[in-house]
C-alpha cells in the first residue's frame, strides 16, 4: 500500500507539472523553479513534512522536495548558528544531489557529442 500511495502522490505532482506545461504554456524552467519555490513555501509552513509522512517516496523524489530540503537545512542551521547558519544550511542537505548532478552531467558531456 505504501508503494501505491507513493506512486499516486508522486504522479499527482507530475500531473500538475504537465498541466502547467500544456495548459499555461510555461517553459520547463518556469515549472521547475515554481516547484522548488512551492516546496520551500510548504516547508516554511510545516506542511511538506506532513506530506512526506503521508506520501513517502512520492513526496521526496520530485523537484518539490529540493526546495523543501534547501529551506529545511537553512532553518535548522539558523537555529544553531544564527544568521550565518542560513548560508551554511542551504547546501547541507542538498550538496550530495548537486554534486551527483554535476558529476553525471560531466560524464555524459564527455561521452556524447552535442548536436549542432
From Swiss-Prot:
It comes from the Bacteria. Pfam families: SpoVAC_SpoVAEB. One of its GO terms (biological process) is sporulation resulting in formation of a cellular spore. The keyword Acetylation does not apply. Transmembrane segments: none annotated. Keywords: Sporulation. Signal peptide: none annotated. This is Stage V sporulation protein AEB. It comes from Bacillus subtilis (strain 168). The gene is spoVAEB.
Amino acid at each position: 500500500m505504501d508503494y501505491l500511495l507513493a506512486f499516486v502522490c508522486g504522479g499527482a505532482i507530475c500531473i500538475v507539472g504537465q498541466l502547467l506545461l500544456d495548459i499555461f504554456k510555461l517553459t520547463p524552467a518556469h515549472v521547475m523553479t515554481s516547484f522548488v519555490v512551492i516546496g520551500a513555501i510548504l516547508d516554511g509552513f510545516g506542511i511538506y513534512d506532513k506530506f512526506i509522512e503521508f506520501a513517502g517516496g512520492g513526496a521526496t523524489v520530485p523537484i518539490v522536495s529540493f526546495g523543501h530540503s534547501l529551506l529545511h537545512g537553512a532553518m535548522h542551521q539558523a537555529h544553531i548558528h544564527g544568521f550565518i547558519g542560513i548560508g551554511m544550511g542551504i547546501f547541507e542537505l542538498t550538496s550530495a544531489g548537486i554534486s551527483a548532478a554535476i558529476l553525471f552531467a560531466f560524464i555524459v558531456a564527455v561521452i556524447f557529442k552535442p548536436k549542432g
